[in-house]
Amino acid sequence: MEASAGLVAGSHNRNELVVIRRDGDPGPKPLRQQNGQVCQICGDDVGLNPDGEPFVACNECAFPVCRDCYEYERREGTQNCPQCKTRFKRLRGCARVPGDEEEDGVDDLENEFNWRDRNDSQYVAESMLHAHMSYGRGGVDVNGVPQPFQPNPNVPLLTDGQMVDDIPPEQHALVPSFMGGGGKRIHPLPYADPNLPVQPRSMDPSKDLAAYGYGSVAWKERMESWKQKQERLHQMRNDGGGKDWDGDGDDGDLPLMDEARQPLSRKVPIPSSQINPYRMVIIIRLVVLGFFFHYRVMHPVPDAFALWLISVICEIWFAMSWILDQFPKWFPIERETYLDRLTLRFDKEGQTSQLAPIDFFVSTVDPLKEPPLVTANTVLSILAVDYPVDKVSCYVSDDGAAMLTFEALSETSEFAKKWVPFCKKYSIEPRAPEWYFQQKIDYLKDKVAPYFVRERRAMKREYEEFKVRINALVAKAQKVPEEGWTMQDGTPWPGNNVRDHPGMIQVFLGQSGGHDIEGNELPRLVYVSREKRPGYNHHKKAGAMNALVRVSAVLTNAPYMLNLDCDHYINNSKAIKEAMCFMMDPLVGKKVCYVQFPQRFDGIDRHDRYANRNVVFFDINMKGLDGIQGPIYVGTGCVFRRQALYGYDAPKTKKPPSRTCNCWPKWCICCCCFGDRKSKKKTTKPKTEKKKRSFFKRAENQSPAYALGEIEEGAPGAENEKAGIVNQQKLEKKFGQSSVFVASTLLENGGTLKSASPASLLKEAIHVISCGYEDKTDWGKEIGWIYGSVTEDILTGFKMHCHGWRSIYCIPKLPAFKGSAPLNLSDRLHQVLRWALGSVEIFFSNHCPLWYGYGGGLKCLERFSYINSIVYPFTSIPLLAYCTLPAICLLTGKFITPELTNVASLWFMSLFICIFATGILEMRWSGVGIDDWWRNEQFWVIGGVSSHLFALFQGLLKVIAGIDTSFTVTSKGGDDEEFSELYTFKWTTLLIPPTTLLLLNFIGVVAGVSNAINNGYESWGPLFGKLFFAFWVIVHLYPFLKGLVGRQNRTPTIVIVWSILLASIFSLLWVRIDPFLAKNDGPLLEECGLDCN
């Protein structure tokens, strides 16, 4: 879509549409079309048969397949044509394979039975050997990890190719062609020693030399390039450069197209010296826990039975919570990407880029809490991303229908015409101007050109003027006119009533409008505000994201999408290419539903006392999940596959037979594998859905493996097959009453309908964002962002994993995205409250991981992780009780354990050692610092006794009484002094429980010490255990305490009054029940013999 001349607003229900943009949308650029003489599997030339005619593998449909792929498919694959599924017949000159029909004629016994002499001159030595032998040349193991290629003496060498015209006739050699199709051939090549010379092959004098490629200028140039690379490779081997043979090298002079065929990413397992001790300690800790609980249960405390029982229940709950959190971290991995290989394969210089298009989603609600300048920086970083501009579209969702956001976006589009060419010209990072100009670095380093200095200063002045204009709009928006806002042409702003307004779309930038100052094209920038009417449930952020999915499908329909919060800018301009290394990888990409990046933050104090960075979760838990089925979706910084969001199952892959012993029962093997795969229930599906694709079938260019198993694209007669499997009525019931959108869902590789005009597309876009479009459809249930929780991200990722998809965790060296985090504790607790409330809502919903999704594609340990993510708020009750126990013990003089024996002390000490050892080894393999680990432990207690507790009760009220709770948007970025709000405490009831706990434990410590002084030295021994227990609570609440008394007594008086009152009442109650005064031990009257009468 091109840039629009005006705002398009309308309501499908009211049959209204205003300001239609002009026609002339050229549409997305099509990918390079391949002719019929190119192999549709590997991309090489089809070549000729021994008679000099074009090689035809399948006599039924003449599907273009080269001889090498034909022989490999017959030998290693399904032996069927990829298009018509007809079994390949043996052709003259090919070896016989099991299953071939008996033939009467004897034409070539040598080829038929593969009788050949390896020293025969008809063979060619395979010489193109790449240093990274571990990838791209071998098979694939059960987990999809490429294995090193092993030479097979029964596999003949390649025998087709082209002759080289600069070699004497008596030394003509046949060299396999590696350059066709962009280097996408993936079938294994036979092993040969590169030190051997190229074996000559005689030419048939009866054939024309052109049949062998003789005299080809292109081949001559490629041969010269190949010779040079072979010389470098031979020299590297002679110089002891064999270090690269294990795949660890990074030599750019290795054979080019070998590099282009290599995987785009690889797994990097944690070294065994780091992960194995960690696993051993976990097992030891489980054993120690068993003995510990045996002692605790078998040794109650008679005089403090209630305290003992409460403590044991809390400890058992903590142990179960630890198991749910620990075992998903059993298989942590890291990943590497190869951007150079991605460039070689899909983005060659001087050629049309074949990288997949991507749609960016930015969501915002309230411009007063989410400053427009912050949103503008996010949009600018997207428009300047290092990606082909015709492949990028940015959609900004304004769920508040604010004219301020609309005008700020208009100003941003104008400034982008200057900012984007500056970023790409000098390759600056980051490409958000606010953060680029705030960098405290020497910007002259490696930038010695005087014109860069001048242009940087000029651009900084331009940005300062841009900020002035944005701030002026913000100041103007503070005073709302009584009659409402009006646009520049005097038209009333359609969104004056936030709860009742039509849908609005404005295209600011595009292909035919809004070029930058250098005349280059800019990415599309589209403003979207969905329709809102009273009486409709709009589902907050999840509903806004689903509206963006639909409107983007109508206008651009990119196969991939990336969603960002308005305060998360792109810090690494190559982040999208990092994600494409997984999404577009021919080996693993088809089953990847999304690529999640970690969240990194700016503006956090060095000590991070409120654990805003969440390093433990992003650098430990998420790495562990990546080794199972992938990380959970965290709401931002995630690249999605559009088809996965449409609720389709992941493509089924045919795994090679395992090399395990068949003498064990199947159920025993499953138990040993942690139950990753359960026996699948029999379903009555069409045969076309039951057919599994071979490794070669999934590598095709012409017909990519469709995630649904429902639609096959690109093959003749596919339209008839679609009509037989999926009818239009069912699709409209699933996706909604929009024929244009339904048609877009059938295009796995994206793209819009060329027959539709821009005006009709805009009208359809208004229709799909209407408030009633989702009624009686699967939106929010099976499609898109899932409804039912304020944490829609967890539900959405969970549904995709249940469909068998896997996700990828990508951690580039330069953080991909950065955002802002709440500075003060009150905002941080409200943020955690919202997350915990969403988990409670999921727990009481139909999508609870405890009972949903069995028999699907969700793995066992992945389910553990999801269960942990929704039950953790319930830990707040035992945590609150356990943190209260030290004060009770000190006030009453009792304790939760009896007097410890030597054996009991051994179990207690062993448990403490295992706890510390687990943390230390976890930090060792993950690289997390002890400060971050300890801050995470502290905030686990602070959030547990405040936000998680309130979320639990609010969730119960919502489920039982139907009382809905609303959340407020966390404030993003401000102009205040750095860290000025660090100690600011805003009034919130969340502050009362931790303050009360602090006062209770301080009172308990004072009371315990006073009691010990009154009763003498003997009482000091038991006191140490109680004091340690109390100090454990106080130390975990220390960041809260420091903020409470940190600066200028900013703590609200009402918080202090309520906390003191509750602590005093609680303490006096226990004193009244069981005072800690010394009891009278005088003689009994019956024993003293005195008659008092």
Swiss-Prot record:
UniProt organism field: Oryza sativa subsp. japonica
Lineage of origin: Eukaryota, Viridiplantae, Streptophyta, Embryophyta, Tracheophyta
Involved pathway(s): Glycan metabolism; plant cellulose biosynthesis
Entry protein name: Probable cellulose synthase A catalytic subunit 3 [UDP-forming]
Binding site for Zn(2+) 1: C39, C42, C66, C69
Gene that encodes it: CESA3
Superkingdom of the source species: Eukaryota
Main location, first listed in the record: membrane
Membrane-spanning residues: 281-301, 304-324, 870-890, 903-923, 940-960, 989-1009, 1021-1041, 1051-1071
Cellular compartments annotated: Cell membrane
